[in-house]
Protein backbone atom coordinates (compact mmCIF):
# COMPACT_ATOMS: atom_id res chain seq x y z
CA UNK A 1 0.00 0.00 0.00
CA UNK A 2 2.81 2.42 0.86
CA UNK A 3 4.24 2.60 -2.69
CA UNK A 4 0.82 3.77 -3.90
CA UNK A 5 0.67 6.45 -1.21
CA UNK A 6 4.21 7.63 -1.87
CA UNK A 7 4.22 7.68 -5.67
CA UNK A 8 5.44 11.17 -6.67
CA UNK A 9 4.71 12.31 -3.11
CA UNK A 10 7.35 15.06 -3.07
CA UNK A 11 5.31 16.89 -5.68
CA UNK A 12 1.72 16.29 -4.56
CA UNK A 13 2.43 16.41 -0.79
CA UNK A 14 -0.77 17.76 0.82
CA UNK A 15 -0.59 20.70 3.19
CA UNK A 16 -4.15 20.92 4.49
CA UNK A 17 -4.75 19.10 7.77
CA UNK A 18 -7.85 17.31 6.51
CA UNK A 19 -5.92 15.79 3.59
CA UNK A 20 -2.98 14.82 5.79
CA UNK A 21 -5.35 13.09 8.23
CA UNK A 22 -7.05 11.21 5.39
CA UNK A 23 -3.71 9.81 4.23
CA UNK A 24 -2.60 8.95 7.75
CA UNK A 25 -5.91 7.11 8.23
CA UNK A 26 -5.00 4.80 5.35
CA UNK A 27 -1.70 3.94 7.02
CA UNK A 28 -3.44 3.40 10.35
CA UNK A 29 -5.95 1.01 8.78
CA UNK A 30 -3.07 -0.80 7.07
CA UNK A 31 -1.32 -1.22 10.42
CA UNK A 32 -4.48 -2.77 11.87
CA UNK A 33 -4.66 -5.12 8.91
CA UNK A 34 -0.97 -6.13 9.03
CA UNK A 35 -1.05 -6.81 12.79
CA UNK A 36 -4.61 -8.20 12.69
CA UNK A 37 -5.51 -5.99 15.64
CA UNK A 38 -8.95 -4.43 15.60
CA UNK A 39 -9.11 -3.28 19.24
CA UNK A 40 -10.48 0.24 19.75
CA UNK A 41 -8.68 1.07 23.00
CA UNK A 42 -6.78 4.39 23.11
CA UNK A 43 -3.14 4.10 22.08
CA UNK A 44 -3.57 0.87 20.14
CA UNK A 45 -2.77 2.38 16.75
CA UNK A 46 0.24 4.28 18.07
CA UNK A 47 1.62 1.06 19.56
CA UNK A 48 1.01 -0.79 16.29
CA UNK A 49 2.80 1.88 14.26
CA UNK A 50 5.73 1.84 16.70
CA UNK A 51 5.92 -1.97 16.60
CA UNK A 52 5.96 -1.87 12.80
CA UNK A 53 8.48 1.01 12.87
CA UNK A 54 6.30 3.02 10.51
CA UNK A 55 6.90 6.76 10.85
CA UNK A 56 4.03 9.09 9.94
CA UNK A 57 3.58 9.49 6.19
CA UNK A 58 3.98 13.25 6.56
CA UNK A 59 7.53 12.71 7.87
CA UNK A 60 8.31 10.33 5.01
CA UNK A 61 7.04 12.88 2.47
CA UNK A 62 9.17 15.62 4.04
CA UNK A 63 12.25 13.40 3.76
CA UNK A 64 11.34 12.57 0.16
CA UNK A 65 10.96 16.28 -0.70
CA UNK A 66 14.28 17.22 0.87
CA UNK A 67 16.00 14.26 -0.79
CA UNK A 68 14.64 15.23 -4.21
CA UNK A 69 15.83 18.81 -3.65
CA UNK A 70 19.25 17.49 -2.60
CA UNK A 71 19.44 15.39 -5.78
CA UNK A 72 18.56 18.42 -7.89
CA UNK A 73 21.29 20.47 -6.22
CA UNK A 74 23.85 17.68 -6.63
CA UNK A 75 22.87 17.17 -10.29
CA UNK A 76 21.66 13.61 -9.64
CA UNK A 77 18.13 14.30 -10.84
CA UNK A 78 16.60 15.16 -14.18
CA UNK A 79 14.88 18.04 -12.40
CA UNK A 80 16.68 21.33 -12.77
CA UNK A 81 16.20 24.13 -10.30
CA UNK A 82 14.21 27.02 -11.77
CA UNK A 83 15.96 30.34 -12.29
CA UNK A 84 13.92 31.94 -9.48
CA UNK A 85 15.72 29.75 -6.93
CA UNK A 86 18.98 31.37 -5.93
CA UNK A 87 21.51 30.89 -3.20
CA UNK A 88 21.75 33.59 -0.54
CA UNK A 89 24.10 36.43 -1.42
CA UNK A 90 25.54 36.80 2.03
CA UNK A 91 26.33 34.29 4.71
CA UNK A 92 25.80 34.96 8.38
CA UNK A 93 27.48 33.13 11.23
CA UNK A 94 24.16 31.52 12.08
CA UNK A 95 23.49 30.25 8.53
CA UNK A 96 25.18 27.78 6.22
CA UNK A 97 26.69 28.20 2.77
CA UNK A 98 24.02 25.99 1.14
CA UNK A 99 21.20 28.34 2.08
CA UNK A 100 18.67 29.47 -0.54
CA UNK A 101 16.65 32.66 -0.73
CA UNK A 102 13.09 31.91 0.31
CA UNK A 103 10.45 32.64 -2.30
CA UNK A 104 7.75 35.22 -1.54
CA UNK A 105 4.45 33.65 -2.52
CA UNK A 106 1.24 35.63 -2.76
CA UNK A 107 -1.21 32.77 -2.41
CA UNK A 108 -1.63 30.03 0.18
CA UNK A 109 -1.44 27.33 -2.47
CA UNK A 110 1.89 28.61 -3.80
CA UNK A 111 3.20 29.10 -0.25
CA UNK A 112 2.68 25.37 0.28
CA UNK A 113 4.06 24.29 -3.09
CA UNK A 114 7.11 22.03 -3.46
CA UNK A 115 9.78 24.71 -3.79
CA UNK A 116 8.45 27.14 -1.17
CA UNK A 117 8.02 24.48 1.51
CA UNK A 118 11.21 22.63 0.69
CA UNK A 119 13.45 25.71 0.64
CA UNK A 120 12.10 26.81 4.02
CA UNK A 121 12.75 23.35 5.50
CA UNK A 122 16.13 23.11 3.72
CA UNK A 123 17.31 26.36 5.28
CA UNK A 124 16.39 25.07 8.75
CA UNK A 125 18.56 21.93 8.45
CA UNK A 126 21.81 21.80 10.43
CA UNK A 127 25.11 22.37 8.62
CA UNK A 128 26.39 18.84 9.19
CA UNK A 129 23.41 17.40 7.29
CA UNK A 130 23.68 19.86 4.40
CA UNK A 131 27.37 19.14 3.95
CA UNK A 132 26.63 15.49 3.08
CA UNK A 133 27.06 14.93 -0.65
CA UNK A 134 26.04 11.28 -0.98
CA UNK A 135 22.26 10.99 -1.29
CA UNK A 136 21.86 7.78 0.72
CA UNK A 137 23.80 9.24 3.66
CA UNK A 138 21.85 12.50 3.38
CA UNK A 139 18.57 10.60 3.50
CA UNK A 140 19.73 8.60 6.53
CA UNK A 141 20.82 11.80 8.30
CA UNK A 142 17.37 13.31 7.70
CA UNK A 143 15.72 10.46 9.60
CA UNK A 144 17.85 11.36 12.63
CA UNK A 145 17.05 15.11 12.53
Predicted regions and their residues:
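Hydrophobic/basic alpha-helical segments
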Residues: 1-145
